[in-house]
């Protein structure tokens, strides 16, 4: 059994840890409000842009003059998985869930005879993916030191991904990130990004005749790169909100667990102290009787 000094030391240590986790929970809660507002503000624009691109794509179809980001390379042998992670831990299963979704997709593609490459954003997913898929990380985007990752970083990432696409490094690109639902729920999500996938259902028609100037293909040539950037930007914002939500929940759980452990250790400490006092009293009484 641990001594009173050891028990007291453990209680002090756990209380110190509890103060840290409580402070981190409060910081995450403050950051969550800002990140959630940014993610929710970006969703309508990103979804509307996807709808416009899908509508134009359905009109252009697979014509020979269609932009490459729409028509594709004509094959689907090599797939690039763009995986968005964070640089920090203490966020529960936030990073591991994204890596798991990307891993499952990679294994599925490899079982079909496809070649899989990875473009990684953030540090946390690198060790696992490097171990599971050695030699398949084509590039890494370092976010170390970036306080609030945003549109500038999304533009750099999308520009590099499209550069690799034009160079023939891959045929299909998928984006993996965590979709924010609430502080308690974040969903690891994967979606095809390049070439633009056909809409799940035919775009709704308003009944009005629409003419495009200079033309659908020219407009698509301008919108498609922007759409790639916006989808990555949306993923980064969703990730930021998801990370703070997961961190707040994890720190709340850690704070409550620390409280429970403190209570248990305090009970053990009091029982041990009471037993020691009782033993001393018995020894004193026995000594007095001997006299």
Curated annotation (Swiss-Prot):
It is a peripheral membrane protein. CDD domains: F1-ATPase_gamma. PROSITE patterns: ATPASE_GAMMA. Its main location: membrane. Keywords: ATP synthesis, Cell inner membrane, Cell membrane, CF(1), Hydrogen ion transport, Ion transport, Membrane, Transport. One of its GO terms (biological process) is proton motive force-driven plasma membrane ATP synthesis. One of its GO terms (molecular function) is ATP binding. It holds the Pfam family ATP-synt. The keyword Calcium does not apply. It is found in: Cell inner membrane. One of its GO terms (cellular component) is plasma membrane. SUPFAM superfamilies: ATP synthase (F1-ATPase), gamma subunit. F-type ATPases have 2 components, CF(1) - the catalytic core - and CF(0) - the membrane proton channel. CF(1) has five subunits: alpha(3), beta(3), gamma(1), delta(1), epsilon(1). CF(0) has three main subunits: a, b and c. Belongs to the ATPase gamma chain family. HAMAP family: ATP_synth_gamma_bact. This is ATP synthase gamma chain. It comes from Sphingopyxis alaskensis (strain DSM 13593 / LMG 18877 / RB2256) (Sphingomonas alaskensis). The gene is atpG.
């Amino acid at each position: 059994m641990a001594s009173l000094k050891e028990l007291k030391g453990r209680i002090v240590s756990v209380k110190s840890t509890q103060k840290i986790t409580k402070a981190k929970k409060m910081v995450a809660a403050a950051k969550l409000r800002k990140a959630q507002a940014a993610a929710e503000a970006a969703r309508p624009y990103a979804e509307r842009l996807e709808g416009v691109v899908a509508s134009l794509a359905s009109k252009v179809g697979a014509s020979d003059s269609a932009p490459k980001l729409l028509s594709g390379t004509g094959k689907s042998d090599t797939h690039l998985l763009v995986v968005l992670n964070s640089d920090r831990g203490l966020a529960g299963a936030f990073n591991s869930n994204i890596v798991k979704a990307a891993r499952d997709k990679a294994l599925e593609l490899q079982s079909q005879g496809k070649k899989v490459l990875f473009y990684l954003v953030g540090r946390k997913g690198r060790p696992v993916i490097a171990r599971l898929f050695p030699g398949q990380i084509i590039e890494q985007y370092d976010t170390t030191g970036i306080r609030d990752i945003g549109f500038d970083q999304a533009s750099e990432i999308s520009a590099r991904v499209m550069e690799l696409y034009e160079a023939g490094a891959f045929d299909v690109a998928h984006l993996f990130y965590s979709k924010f639902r609430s502080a308690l729920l974040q969903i690891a999500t994967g979606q095809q990004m390049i070439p633009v996938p056909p809409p799940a259902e035919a775009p709704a028609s308003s009944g009005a005749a629409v003419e495009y100037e200079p033309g659908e293909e020219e407009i698509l040539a301008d919108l498609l790169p922007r759409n790639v950037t916006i989808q990555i930007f949306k993923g980064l914002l969703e990730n930021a909100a998801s990370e703070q939500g997961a961190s707040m929940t994890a720190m709340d759980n850690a704070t409550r667990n620390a409280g429970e452990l403190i209570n248990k250790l305090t009970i053990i400490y009091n029982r041990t102290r009471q037993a020691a006092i009782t033993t001393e009293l018995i020894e004193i009484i026995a000594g007095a009787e001997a006299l």
